[in-house]
């Protein structure tokens, strides 16, 4: 739930508005609630029936990593150069981890990586209204074994993290000039770190949105992860106890501890709701 105009509403409600209507709500709220700090912890910026989708092989580094891991490398080279992008479903609201919440590596996977990504927050009218930080946790061993296993490598409980909030699109003048930094802490030390920029993104953001909405509808809006330009070198793999920190210019830092398997989540309640 999100405080707007002295009341609480869902983010899904806001994503049913047009971009102009949403700007008006944000401007009015900024005037009436200036200086009021949000109460309580930050939750994942997703709720209701809003879905998370993702684009793949949109950076050269991603294409190289997929070729490296796969027994059928040519399919990744072909999609990298094709007009049609790779788009796939990633998560529902209840499967998403928010800031500080654990992300999961599959218990039946031997090679797992975080994928730091710029995520587009898109309203029901296919307008980009905001941006957030995403972590598309993936099993390289499962996808590398057979590309048809991609849903198992990508779609499971807490394989996606979003946060720390949503930055309005009007506050990000050039989304193609954002530095993306990732650090993986292991035993309180940097186990891996790297940096890239959205300047390296091969696809245009509006093209990705157009393909996503071409034959689909999203009444509660949608969040679209735009692919990763950072992939840890072989044979690095995430381990339980690691912490992944992803920072994107103007959007903030998303940090999540790592657990192995859904059993590692225990009986933690889910904060993002889904009917």
Label for each model-derived stretch:
Residues 1-4, 125-134, 189-194, 269:
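Short, well-ordered strand-loop elements centered on a beta-strand within folded domains, enriched
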Residues 1-52, 207, 256-275:
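Generic N-terminal segment detector
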Residues 4, 8, 76, 88-89, ...:
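Phenylalanine-focused residue identity feature
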Residues 16-188:
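Active-site microenvironments in enzyme catalytic cores
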Residues 140-275:
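Catalytic-pocket segment enriched in acidic/His residues
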């Amino acid at each position: 739930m999100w405080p707007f105009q002295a009341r609480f509403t869902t983010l899904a409600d806001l994503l049913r508005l047009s971009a102009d209507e949403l700007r008006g709500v944000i401007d009015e709220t900024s005037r009436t609630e200036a200086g009021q700090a949000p109460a309580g912890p930050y939750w994942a910026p997703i709720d209701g029936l809003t879905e998370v989708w993702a684009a793949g092989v949109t950076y050269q580094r991603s294409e190289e990593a997929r070729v490296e891991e796969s027994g059928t490398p040519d399919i990744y080279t072909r999609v990298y150069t094709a007009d049609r992008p790779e788009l796939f479903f990633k998560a529902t609201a209840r499967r998403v981890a928010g800031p500080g919440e654990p992300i999961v590596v599959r218990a039946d996977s031997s090679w797992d990586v975080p994928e730091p990504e710029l995520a587009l927050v898109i309203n029901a009218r296919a307008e980009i209204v905001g941006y957030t930080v995403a972590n598309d946790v993936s099993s390289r061993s499962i996808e590398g074994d057979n590309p048809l296993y991609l849903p198992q490598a990508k779609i499971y409980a807490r394989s996606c993290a979003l946060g720390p909030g949503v930055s309005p699109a009007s506050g990000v003048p050039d989304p193609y000039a954002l530095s993306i930094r990732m650090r993986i802490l292991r035993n309180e030390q940097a186990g891996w770190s790297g940096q890239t920029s959205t300047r390296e993104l091969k696809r245009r953001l509006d093209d990705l949105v157009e393909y996503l909405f071409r034959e689909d509808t999203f009444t509660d809006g949608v969040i679209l992860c735009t692919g990763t330009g950072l992939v840890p070198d072989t044979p690095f793999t995430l381990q339980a106890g690691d912490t992944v920190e992803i920072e994107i210019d103007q959007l903030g830092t998303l940090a999540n501890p790592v657990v192995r398997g859904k059993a590692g989540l225990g009986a933690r309640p889910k904060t993002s709701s889904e009917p």
